[in-house]
């Protein structure tokens, strides 16, 4: 059993009431670094009064694996469920190939999450291990919550929950499309007098002269290099 139990997420004053992570095996336990609670003990305005305060000088939390033999694998990916809300604390992963003495090749887990934003509770992360880490006979992986970044006079906050950590062989070909968006004039927007909202109807003549923008970020998570990648958009 755990205290608190697996039905409780963050207990911090500014993140309390958040549900726990919705990973496949959350009912048998998960890891949480509750930066909010550790700083204020669940009391609004109680900055620096918690059991492991982040204010006034910051705090750090780490979770490190035992040694893992990856000598037979040239391309490896780290996959896990992550529920993360950010104020100034940053979720990171680092790797060691010298028995856990030093950790390098640091990777930010959620670089797309801004201040006061959060992932979904069932978010799944996939990170490709650096080439100099895959293939090594002794690898330690460290999950690292960095609450030493100062923002708006405060350190840390809010929380990071992880569960169902596993290593897989990186698929040869795997694309992920993110940050998809459409709408808005990208040509002649200063003279059309139209906001280009995605619910707007326009005559074809105007649409041809002032086309919509369709864009996204395509990430290659596969082991193979990909060339001449083209993003297609379909309007129905």
Task: Indicate residue ranges for each PLM-predicted region.
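Surface-exposed, low-complexity/disordered Ser/Thr/Gly/Pro/Asn-rich loops and linkers
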Residues: 2-72, 159-161
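Extracellular acidic, Ser/Thr/Pro-rich low-complexity tracts
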Residues: 23, 84-86, 218-224
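Extracellular beta-strand-rich recognition modules
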Residues: 63-65, 70-85, 91, 95, ...
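Extracellular carbohydrate recognition and processing domains
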Residues: 102-135
